[in-house]
Regions:
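Short loop-to-beta-strand entry elements in the cores of soluble alpha/beta enzymes
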Residues: 59-68, 179
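Glycine/small-residue-rich phosphate/adenosyl-binding loop
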Residues: 66-151
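C-terminal helix-cap and adjacent tail motif
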Residues: 11-13, 196-229
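Solvent-exposed alpha-helices and their adjacent loops that cap or buttress functional pockets
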Residues: 56-59, 132-135, 196-199
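Conserved hydrophobic/aromatic beta-strand scaffold that supports enzyme active sites
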Residues: 23, 140-142, 205-207
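Small-aliphatic-rich amphipathic alpha-helix that forms the alpha element of a beta-alpha
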Residues: 46-51, 139-192
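Short, surface-exposed beta-edge/turn micro-motifs
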Residues: 61-62, 137-140, 202-203
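N-terminal accessory segments that position/regulate proteins before the catalytic core
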Residues: 1-40, 44-45, 74-79, 83-109
Length: 229
């Protein structure tokens, strides 16, 4: 450990609570970015900040892969669409097999089938030259961790959420890409392309860049259901 990193904590808070709430509410999911590279120093700042995000049992086992190579991003996008195209056909065949056998289609399959319209749109979009996985973002951040650790999913999501907020302080915006997270842990071509350390899985994925659009309003949310006991 570097003892110089044990810095004094200032107990005073330099920002107002309402200002912080407004800042958090101002975070929006961005899917359109300028064709502008993100400086390495800014990425390093965000990565370094993740060191201080809490982890289960203080294990600190999560790792980050940052992809800026446009060719690699395009390959991963195409692999993801391939995966879901295969999944659509596979789910339909499985459901039909259950029906032909006079059996009830399992809930896990019927639930997955509700996503087929969305997945078909993704497949169709590619045919028209659209990139709807990473949205042509200049940076893809993949948060991965050993499966055999205290709280791998929590660790990665806490770190990625920290990035979504900190990025806004340097004029960057983000969006979570859950579709890729699912495919990355299932589809062999993606597994091989990422070549994660043995025993690791992807638990959170962000795209990041300078936003092309500016939002002028926050959005409303459902009231939080809470119990005070």
């Amino acid at each position: 450990m570097d003892m110089e990193n044990f810095i004094d904590i200032d107990s005073s808070v330099s920002f107002d609570t309402q200002d912080f709430i407004h800042f958090v509410r101002g975070r929006r999911s961005h899917r359109r970015f300028l064709e502008k590279d993100v400086p390495r120093k800014d990425l390093e700042t965000l990565v370094d900040l993740c060191r201080y995000a809490p982890t289960g049992s203080n294990r600190q086992t999560l790792e980050i892969m940052i992809i800026q190579d446009r060719g690699k991003i395009e390959r991963l996008s195409n692999y993801t669409v391939d995966f879901f195209e295969n999944e659509i056909d596979s789910l339909a065949r499985e459901a039909e097999a259950y029906r032909e056998a006079g059996m009830e289609v399992p809930q896990i399959i019927t639930s997955a089938l509700t996503m087929t319209d969305t997945l078909n749109l993704i497949v169709t979009a590619r045919k028209f030259g659209l990139e709807v996985i990473f949205h042509r973002a200049p940076v893809v951040m993949i948060f991965h961790s050993p499966v055999e650790t205290s709280c791998p999913k929590d660790d990665c999501v806490i770190a990625s959420t920290t990035v979504t907020l900190a990025a806004r302080t340097i004029n960057l915006e983000t969006c979570y890409i859950g579709l890729f997270e699912f495919a990355a842990n299932t589809y062999q071509p993606i597994v091989e392309e990422l070549n994660l350390p043995e025993g690791h899985k992807v638990y959170s994925v962000l795209i990041l860049g300078y936003p092309e659009l500016q939002f002028y309003r926050t959005v409303d949310r459902k009231p939080m259901r809470v119990q005070y006991l």
